[in-house]
Amino acid sequence: GKTINKSRHAYALGQLVLWSPIDDLIDTKASILQSRDFRFIAMANPKIAPYGEATRQTLTSMNLWKALEEKLIRGENIAQTFQFVNSGNAKLGFISFSQIVNSNYEVNGSYWKVPKSLYEPIEQQVVLLNESFLAEDFLSYLLSEESQKIISRFGYDIPL
């Protein structure tokens, strides 16, 4: 292969949330999903976006995929999905927790952190493509305790 042997590592795990800019719309059980009291719900495209696939898995685990299918609007990625909700085109949507805690502006509203048991881990991975002291140093830093604390502060879980 074209990668350095044993250099592939998961350094962060994405966390899926259901978010709305409307205060108190989403409760701790995401009851709104069962009530279906919304016109549209945004998600990333599950065919090309890991968070979209995690959303599909979540709704399937909750036996809601078929029931909500006609209300789903799909963004190409979670950035576009966030914009659908933030602009009001959808009342709520599934995004990355990091988009709420790491925003260039204050993000208001309500959210439900999706239990990890409802979707496969969303691994953020790194791999070295060639021998380079700088790349190896960066990889060491990325996997260091110092870096992991920063990554965690920005809304990601740390793999064991």
Map each language-model feature to its residues.
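Exported/periplasmic ABC-transporter solute-binding proteins
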Residues: G1, S7-L160
